[in-house]
């Protein structure tokens, strides 16, 4: 953006020109208000219907900054940006089996010819078809293709604002490599790029081992913003840094434990019971359905669902231990025949050693890791630490897919005279989720939001209560300011010129909007050329004096009166050791 030749402030940098209708929080709202409500009251989002939101101009600015960071880091690892259609045919999804397995989450429709279509929740099938059409030789690999588009998912219970929306903005990248070794190298390289993205965004985050779910693949990691309000639970070891979600986490052996017995019912596509069997897990733990399903012959029974049917008491657990001790081969009364004849009884390897050793000698019992880890368990990585629960909000997920999609859709390349399936990966970042998650994690107080500097809609707002004849001068000063060598720019400064509102309303709005720097031109500006500077920056801690200026404040906000000639020096020092713009 360029300033007008006569030095005037562009209309686009004035709040009077913006679609903005804030609502002051009520007295009872300060502690209980959800982040989605805060964003609504601050004029960032507007709910259209359940799980569907309009991103208003301020939110769109935040999204644009998040997208710019992600775009730069994806291009830095060789990503090429494209835009695939949101409206897709079902053929690819039927070929991979996801048309049936995810049908409940798909928005489907028919055109005037009664042809089925779907609104894309993700694009593995489509991008595989594109590469199949255009790539013939391994010499055309690797490829890393990404997009930032709207996605659609029929959430059963849309809630929590943008965190569980039915329409959302997502960055998804897809990688194509000639073999597994190079595909895993790509996975590691993109993981590092993701870390750079979240480092730049400036919200504390965790990287956790994860289950691949319906996407598929054997290698998977999640990126989470750490927040006590998060719906996800991570299990972390403070000793060695191990981190995983509860479905994926593995517990170490620790102390010897007794056993609890659970009955698992396996149901088919038409809710018919295929079979049932017993799972023996450490006392006080629950079986892990994802780990159990991984060993079930899904190829024999499509769309299997595992249902945990209660927990047997201590008496039956003792009886089971006795039964295992005395059992031999197929005479064991623990086993339940399946249609494939594969599984009799699953016994967790972390039950007491005597029982585990006995189980190893019984051919009809399968020993493995069948339980859900929980806080207090020993860490399986370092074997000396203890797992702790940590609440978090998922904002990114990366997968090594292998040949799941390339094999289903017959994507091959010619390599040394042989045709081989391409190895794939997919990498998602929830752009609109980050918008709300960052607001959630930045410790808003009763006065309003607090945005990380890198993604705030504006770096600074000027509130002229007096001395308005010098507003253009201050605007130019802030726009030309450099922090860590980067010019702030006119597009990052806004003036609250809404003279029709009271001074108190505009000052409250400055806090409500969460813009990091507020410069107030009041009486002291007219009398002594001093402006009041308010800093609302997550994680910013300042000493009592910065650049010779006295600073006062609390955990949420810092204030100082600064002579206009020292304003740039003061802000440069305040931000210089904190973050980058």
Segments from the language model and where they lie:
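NTP/phosphate- and nucleic-acid-binding module
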Residues: 1-581
């Amino acid at each position: 953006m360029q300033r007008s030749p006569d030095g005037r402030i562009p209309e686009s940098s004035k709040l009077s020109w913006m679609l903005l209708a804030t609502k002051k929080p009520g007295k009872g709202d300060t502690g209980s208000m959800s982040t989605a409500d805060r964003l609504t009251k601050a004029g960032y989002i507007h709910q259209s219907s359940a799980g569907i939101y309009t991103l208003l101009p301020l939110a769109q600015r935040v999204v644009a900054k998040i997208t710019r960071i992600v775009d730069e880091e994806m291009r830095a690892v060789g990503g090429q940006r494209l835009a695939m259609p949101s409206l897709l045919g079902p053929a690819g999804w039927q070929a991979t089996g996801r048309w049936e397995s995810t049908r409940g989450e798909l928005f489907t429709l028919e055109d005037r010819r009664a042809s089925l279509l779907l609104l894309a929740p993700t694009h593995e099938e489509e991008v595989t078809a594109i590469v199949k059409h255009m790539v013939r030789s391994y010499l055309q690999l690797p490829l890393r293709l990404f997009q930032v588009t709207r996605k659609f998912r029929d959430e059963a219970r849309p809630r929590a604002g943008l965190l569980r929306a039915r329409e959302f903005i997502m960055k998804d990248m897809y990688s194509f490599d000639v073999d597994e070794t190079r595909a895993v190298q790509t996975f590691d390289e993109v993981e590092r790029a993701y870390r750079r993205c979240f480092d730049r965004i400036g919200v504390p985050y965790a990287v956790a081992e994860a289950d691949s779910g319906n996407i598929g693949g054997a290698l998977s990691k999640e990126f989470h913003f750490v927040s006590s309000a998060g719906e996800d639970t991570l299990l972390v070891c403070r000793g060695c840094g191990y981190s995983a979600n509860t479905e994926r986490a593995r517990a170490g052996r620790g102390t010897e434990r007794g056993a609890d017995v659970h009955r698992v019912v396996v149901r088919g596509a038409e809710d018919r019971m295929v079979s049932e069997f017993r799972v023996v897990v450490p006392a006080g733990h629950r079986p892990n359905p994802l780990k159990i399903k991984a060993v079930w012959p899904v190829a024999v029974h499509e769309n299997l669902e595992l249902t945990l049917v209660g927990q047997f008491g201590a008496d039956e657990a003792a009886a089971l231990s006795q039964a295992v001790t005395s059992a031999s081969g197929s005479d064991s009364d623990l086993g339940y025949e399946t249609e494939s004849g594969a599984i009799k009884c699953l016994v967790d390897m972390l039950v007491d050693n005597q029982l585990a050793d006995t189980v190893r000698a019984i051919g009809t019992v399968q020993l493995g890791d069948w339980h859900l880890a929980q806080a207090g368990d020993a860490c399986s990585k370092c074997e000396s630490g203890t797992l702790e629960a940590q609440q978090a909000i998922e904002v990114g997920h990366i997968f090594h897919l292998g040949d799941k999609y390339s094999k289903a859709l017959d994507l091959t390349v010619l390599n040394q005279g042989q045709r081989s399936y391409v190895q794939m990966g997919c990498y998602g970042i929830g752009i609109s989720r980050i918008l709300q998650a960052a607001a959630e994690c930045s410790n808003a107080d009763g006065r309003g939001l607090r945005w990380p500097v890198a993604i705030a809609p504006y770096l600074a707002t000027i509130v002229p209560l007096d001395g308005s004849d010098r507003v253009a001068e201050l605007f130019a000063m802030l726009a030309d300011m450099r922090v860590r060598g980067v010019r702030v720019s006119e597009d990052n400064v806004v003036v609250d010129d809404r003279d029709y509102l009271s001074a108190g309303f505009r000052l409250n709005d400055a806090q409500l909007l969460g813009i990091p720097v507020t410069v107030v031109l009041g009486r002291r500006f007219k009398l002594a050329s001093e402006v009041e500077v308010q800093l609302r920056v997550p994680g910013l801690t300042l000493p009592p004096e910065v650049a010779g200026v006295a600073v006062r404040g609390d955990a949420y906000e810092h204030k100082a009166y600064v002579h206009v000639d020292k304003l740039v020096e003061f802000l440069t020092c305040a931000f210089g050791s904190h973050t980058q713009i």
